[in-house]
Regions:
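Function-determining surface determinants
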Residues: 1-499
Length: 499
């Protein structure tokens, strides 16, 4: 068994010649005596009709190289930026017919039905590519640098393979990150969060990329150290972000952008906590903030979407004013900046940010404060943070629209901290406390929608209709009353970390 740790970098197929020369130059800079091979690799990937290997996050292939055949199973692992880490097992075979019983029995999870899966294995797709391979000396080991050029084939469809992999084989992981930076800058390479197998499943129509818009509670445990809890939260945020980035790259849409925004927001919240623990995060929080500026258009888009949604509270009334409704719909489309976001995702700065987040998660720097148990620290953090939120929301009898909007970022930040540490507490008590505050946050965001409507009506003679103006005012007053009711009810809830 080997524990695979490799950095995957995607390049544009048109860069193949430049990539080949860049890899040669890198290899020569490491060693004057080149250890180089060129291999033609044919790979067939297998799963059951109901994709049970995929459900276990496993990948099974048989690879042909010259007259040699090798069967490989990759077990569940993780992706940090473009760094892939997962256990891998290999056995030689005599034919292109998979046999799971050739692997040692103790590699499988306890609930893994080896023989049932074996009976139903079928080929799903193939990959054929030329592998250019260099071995680079590094510390007490080496790094395998490979350039793969070829294609994935499934159901008559093809997709180009053009990627560079840097696999650590006992060397210094910092060398991999330094090389990754060089490749990003010279070849406009991007972090590869999807493996060849994952892309093959997509091409074969056996998998789909759907945005994850809602973040869930991070799976932290009371017995973990604070370091384990914070780095796990950061890893979860990065995974959520990168999944949605892959969705954006596959088919640019607003839901993918919203999912990215949620993941980035979570990552930044965790980085700020690490910074308070005196962990050197090397400006990562500020760099994340710069990425967030490319997502600020989502606030206006979501406000317009609230007004035009067919199942929303305002759709029926606004539909009566066809010109206004069409203008709202047009504005909703005009505010979208997906093209600019995709350009940002492909930029050097963005890719180097992902690389540095991956570097932080692999290194996991420690401080004395990070060694404490996470539960008591999380309880104190949530209590102190919430005390500030509570004081702000309880300061007067009635809050204005402007005051609610000003308090929204603080409320959202506090709810996000709850996402990081909520699993440490009783689910029913936790959800009972959070629910009215989440409703309040949604209601405050609705104020933005009504402000947009007010602005558009006010600035246009075409829609200066007295009935519409009065209707708007009624909606704003009704929303404010609902917010006041929710706020006062929420303030009476007992915090779940005190129960």
């Amino acid at each position: 068994m080997s524990q695979e740790l490799e950095l995957k970098l995607m390049i544009e197929p048109k860069q193949r010649e430049n990539a080949l020369q860049t890899c040669r130059d890198i290899a020569q800079n490491f060693s004057k005596q080149l250890d180089y091979q060129e291999l033609e690799l044919e790979n067939a990937y297998y799963d059951t009709s109901d994709l049970r290997l995929r459900q276990f996050d496993m990948g099974l292939r048989i690879r042909r190289s010259a007259d040699q055949l090798e069967q490989t199973i990759k077990l569940a692992g993780r992706v940090l930026g473009g760094m892939h880490e997962r256990p891998e097992y290999n056995v030689p075979v005599l034919e292109m017919s998979p046999d799971l019983t050739l692997f040692e029995e103790d590699i499988w999870p306890d609930d893994f039905p080896v023989y049932d899966i074996q009976r139903d294995l079928q080929q799903l797709f193939v990959t054929d590519f030329t592998r250019h391979r260099w071995i680079l000396p590094s510390a007490d080991g080496q790094i395998e640098l490979v350039l793969d050029l070829g294609q994935i084939n499934a159901n008559g469809e093809t997709q180009q393979i053009a990627e560079i992999e840097l696999e650590l084989q006992g060397g210094d992981v910092e060398d991999i990150y330094s090389l990754g930076e060089q490749i990003v800058e010279q070849l406009n390479a991007r972090m590869g969060s999807l493996s060849k197998a994952a892309r093959g499943y997509l091409l074969a129509g056996r998998s789909v990329l759907e945005p994850f818009v809602q973040t869930h509670f991070v799976a932290v445990k009371a017995e973990q150290s604070l370091a384990e809890a914070l780095y796990r939260s950061l890893e979860y945020g990065l995974r959520h972000w990168q999944h949605n980035e892959a969705c954006l790259d596959n088919h640019a849409n607003v839901r993918a952008a919203q999912g990215m925004a949620d993941g980035i927001y979570l990552c930044r919240a965790v980085l700020e906590q690490l910074q308070r623990m005196e962990v050197d995060i090397d400006g990562l929080a500020e760099r994340l903030g710069r990425v967030q500026t490319h997502l600020t258009w989502l606030k206006r888009f979501e406000g317009l979407a609230e007004l035009t949604a067919e199942d929303g509270a305002y759709h029926r009334a606004l539909k009566r004013y066809s010109g206004l409704y069409e203008l709202l719909m047009d504005n909703q489309q005009q505010v979208v900046q997906l093209h600019q976001l995709v350009e940002q995702v492909h930029s050097h700065d963005y890719q180097l940010l992902l690389l540095d987040l991956s570097r932080l998660l692999i290194a996991r720097p420690q401080t004395e404060e990070l060694q404490q148990p996470c539960e008591q620290w999380a309880t104190t953090l949530l209590r102190d943070d919430w005390r500030e939120v509570q004081q702000e929301f309880a300061e007067t009898e009635d809050l204005s629209e402007e005051r609610y909007l000003k308090l929204l970022p603080k409320l959202q930040h506090s709810l996000m901290l709850g996402t990081c540490f909520g699993m440490l507490f009783d689910p029913a008590t936790r959800d009972n406390f959070r629910s009215p505050w989440q409703d309040l946050a949604r209601g405050i965001r609705e104020i933005t929608a009504l402000h947009i409507l007010h602005e558009m009506v006010k600035n246009s003679d075409d829609f200066n209709d007295q009935k519409l103006i009065e209707w708007q005012q009624v909606q704003r007053e009704s929303l404010l009353k609902a917010l006041e009711y929710s706020r006062k009810a929420a303030l009476k809830r007992e915090p779940y970390w005190q129960v």
